[in-house]
């Protein structure tokens, strides 16, 4: 149908869209946090550092993952465990850093926002999975 073809065209256009640079993503995330949590200037500077560290680590991980994928190398069960373990350790460290910067009220709100974002992401992933299985 024409409608189905339009949907595919839109998906392709989305893939061609330019991605934001890590710096742009960090800047937008910082501004959103500033608005949502009412961050003061010193908090903004500290959060910006945390976001930059996270971004650098994420870029390095993605580069490694892409290089392995291009070579056709899949991680072993042990490597997957190590990666997940490392990711959780980093999440704990980030949480501790953020907690030092924010007030208890801000931290509670940040935790709530993260939880809501995870739930929204889960819903979107389920919708995508349902859409793919229907095709």
Regions found by a protein language model. Give the residues of each.
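Classical N-terminal targeting signals for secretion and organelle import
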Residues: 1-24, 41-42, 67, 78, ...
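Amphipathic alpha-helical segments
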Residues: 19, 25-101, 109, 113
